[in-house]
Structure formats: C-alpha cells, structure tokens
Amino acid sequence: MEFIVEKIGMSRTIGTKSEAVTLLRVLGAKVCEIYDNGKALVAYSQGKSVNKAIAGQQKKYSLSKEFNRFATLKVSNKEVGELDVASLSEAKRVQVSFKTKGRGFSGAMKRWNFQGGPGAHGSRFHRRLGSIGNREWPGRVQPGKKMAGHYGNELVSAKNDIMSFDKQSAILVLKGSVAGFNGAFGRIQIIK
C-alpha cells in the first residue's frame, strides 16, 4: 500500500536509549477511480493552485476545491471513497521516497567532496576542479566526469522502521532520517 505524506521534521525518543526519529503526516486522500492492476487514482490537497484541467477532474469526481492534486497509488480500498490508512497500524517497515534539498549550481568541492588545493597565499588553486582529461588520446573529457553542476533535487528512497502511528492525528513516526526539507511532500510504501 502507498500513501502521500508530508515531512514535519525530526525529533528523538525519550528513554534509556534515545533514538532519532522523523515525523510524517499522512495526507487525507480520496480514491477517485480503481484500476484492474490494484492501483487507484487518488486525490489529495497540496497548496491552493487550480487550473482548468484540475477543475475538470474535480467536477468529474465531485471533489471539493481543496483536493487539487492527483496521483496513482497502490491502495487496499475495494471501492471509491476515503483512502484507508488502517494498514499502517500493523506495518513494521516502509520505503520512503522524497526529493533531496535543492542546492542549485554547486562547485566540485561541495557537490563531490573534492579536496581542493592549498589555502596558502602563493597558491592560485583553492577550490577549482583541476585536470579533467588525459592526453592527446582520448583527447576528450570522459563521460560521467565529476564536475560542477546542478546539485540536489533528486528522488531518493530509503527503508525505515515504523516506531508508531497515531490514526487520530495521522502522524507516522519513523526510526532514523529521510531526505528532503521540512514541509516536503513524498510517498511511503509498506514493505512488511
């Protein structure tokens, strides 16, 4: 089963062995249409933006204005209506997928943890990349060379154990950390 979640932030457990935990809020969602392959079209709320295509979908599935995003998820529901979150109560482990924090155009030292050059005044090689090729042969830069460029904003998945799930407030507590900033939206999938 899959769910759309929002990252609240990190905290820790209080006890003899304190552990770092991540708090996620499971978004309230509505199942609009169920497909034959066990997946379903699910509507959920994210922001306030609505265009004509979304307005048409809201009218088609008779949804309120707040449900302005759609996703295809594996669900346990057998019929259209509220997304069933009861399966999270018995779940032990989930796969969490979030986008990492976007860091824009970054240099090689930040992006790939390169050492860089000496920091002394006489040096003119501080944070630069250095040599990027070989000799006359192959006479080109090899594909996959680690250079400066866009860093972050990549989809990352991790497997985390579930510490607890409060059905009332829809707060899921996971052991360890997950990628992304506080307030980011992602997906979780029950593994076992």
From Swiss-Prot:
Pfam family, one: Ribosomal_L3
GO terms assigned for molecular function: rRNA binding; structural constituent of ribosome
UniProt key word Ribonucleoprotein: yes
UniProt entry keywords in alphabetical sequence: Ribonucleoprotein, Ribosomal protein, RNA-binding, rRNA-binding
Quaternary structure, from the entry: Part of the 50S ribosomal subunit. Forms a cluster with proteins L14 and L19.
Protein's job: One of the primary rRNA binding proteins, it binds directly near the 3'-end of the 23S rRNA, where it nucleates assembly of the 50S subunit.
Protein name: Large ribosomal subunit protein uL3
Gene source species: Helicobacter hepaticus (strain ATCC 51449 / 3B1)
Gene: rplC
